[in-house]
């Protein structure tokens, strides 16, 4: 399939000048064969690269190493970036317990695949890590040249992020208490010689520790709804500011044509002795259509509102994810607690009930621990996101042609 052209025919066509016509006439055939050849070449190249990578991996490692790859560890390593290490350093510095600081500094780098082993440190510090704090934010907004409406919106943004930060801190405390109580109960379920009646009573009592954790779901939704309302206000104000800026830019560009037309008309209609005045008219009139100060102010305001809107949107998505994780844990806890309450109500079947509850706890033990670790790690990443967004907005507020001379301005840091 295809068209073969001999060298003799090519020479004849070349002598007559028909090669361009021939190529144009059969251009689709040339394109078809070119694509077919390119696809075969790329496929062959990919196969060769895969075979070479497999050969290299098999030659440098044992066959058992492929089966021992820990996906959770690889996922965790993806988050150990420069911002992760920077935040971890701040965790150690802000810890009030010197023993914890010394032990964390003397311990080797974190290599465990368990998420709980990596996240033991920040349970002591969360309320100290909000950056910048509310007092600093208040002073920055007071000395900055921000409009009244914009200042109100930015102040509400910092307040909402602070509330979300405090909520995440409370969630961490609840997770810590929940894990400690669960760990104290777990060996008794694994023991073969346990008191079945006391076991169910103890689990029923410990299940009350889940109530503050369960009630936090409504608070998450409340803060998230506040973030969504604030996001609408920020976007509305930003769009209005951009519309004003676009209008001013349009007037600025059209003022040149307007002045030129007006000057030409005046030159034609007025006597020549006023010609010098007409030459100065474009400069005088153009100055009325170039509000450079207002344009710069609107540009900075739009940029600040845009940064705040992006930070609010990301925070709302993080809170939505945290809410889903909390709901998933609540469903599993309610399932086990309902089973325990069912066997408690049976009375005579409490011995069998303890066995059923113990069996159910063994079944969901691993998934329950992983869910707590996943929630804890996402809260930790939410801390970093909140601080990064707040610092970006503060930098945008202080970044101007004549920045205020304030000693509390954030120092230059590495970009998170």
UniProtKB/Swiss-Prot annotation:
The chain crosses the membrane at residues 266-286. It holds the Pfam family DUF677. The keyword Membrane applies. InterPro entries: DUF677. It is found in: Membrane. GO terms for cellular component: membrane. It comes from the Eukaryota. Keywords: Membrane, Transmembrane, Transmembrane helix. Its main location: membrane. The keyword Ribosomal protein does not apply. It is a single-pass membrane protein. PANTHER family: UPF0496 PROTEIN 3, UPF0496 PROTEIN 3-RELATED. Belongs to the UPF0496 family. This is UPF0496 protein At3g49070.
């Amino acid at each position: 399939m295809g068209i073969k052209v001999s060298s003799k025919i090519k020479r004849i066509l070349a002598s007559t000048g028909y090669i361009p016509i021939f190529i144009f006439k059969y251009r689709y055939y040339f394109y078809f064969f070119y694509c077919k050849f390119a696809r075969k070449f790329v496929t062959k190249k990919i196969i060769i690269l895969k075979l070479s990578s497999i050969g290299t991996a098999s030659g440098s490692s044992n066959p058992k190493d492929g089966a021992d790859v820990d996906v959770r560890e690889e996922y965790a390593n993806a988050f150990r970036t420069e911002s992760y290490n920077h935040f971890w350093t701040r965790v150690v510095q802000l810890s009030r317990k010197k023993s914890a600081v010394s032990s964390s500094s003397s311990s080797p780098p974190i290599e465990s695949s368990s998420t709980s082993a990596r996240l033991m440190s920040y349970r002591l510090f969360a309320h100290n890590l909000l950056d910048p704090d509310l007092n600093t934010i208040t002073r920055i907004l007071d000395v900055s040249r921000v409009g009244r409406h914009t200042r109100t919106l930015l102040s509400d943004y910092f307040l909402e992020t602070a509330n979300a930060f405090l909520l995440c801190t409370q969630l961490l405390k609840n997770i810590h208490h929940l894990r400690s109580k669960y760990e104290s109960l777990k060996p008794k379920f694994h023991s073969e010689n346990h008191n079945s009646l006391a076991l169910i009573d103890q689990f029923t009592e410990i299940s009350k520790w889940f109530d503050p954790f369960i009630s936090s779901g409504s608070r998450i939704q409340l803060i998230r709804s506040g973030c969504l309302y604030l996001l609408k206000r920020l976007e509305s104000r930003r769009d209005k500011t951009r519309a004003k800026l676009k209008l001013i830019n349009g007037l600025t560009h059209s003022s040149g044509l307007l002045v030129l037309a007006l000057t030409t008309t005046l030159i034609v209609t007025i006597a020549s002795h006023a010609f010098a005045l007409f030459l100065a008219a474009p400069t005088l009139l153009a100055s009325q259509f170039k509000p450079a100060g207002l344009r710069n102010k609107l540009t900075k305001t739009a940029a600040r509102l845009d940064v705040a809107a992006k930070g609010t949107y990301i925070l709302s998505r993080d809170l939505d994810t945290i809410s889903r994780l909390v709901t998933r844990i609540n469903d599993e806890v309610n399932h086990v607690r309902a089973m325990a309450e069912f066997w408690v109500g049976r009375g005579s079947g409490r011995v069998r009930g303890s066995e059923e509850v113990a069996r159910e706890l063994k079944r969901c033990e691993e998934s329950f621990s992983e869910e707590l670790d996943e929630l804890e790690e996402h809260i930790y990443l939410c801390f970093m996101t909140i601080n990064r967004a707040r610092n970006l907005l503060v930098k945008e507020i202080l970044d101007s042609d004549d920045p205020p001379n304030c000693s509390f301005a954030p120092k230059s840091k590495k970009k998170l």
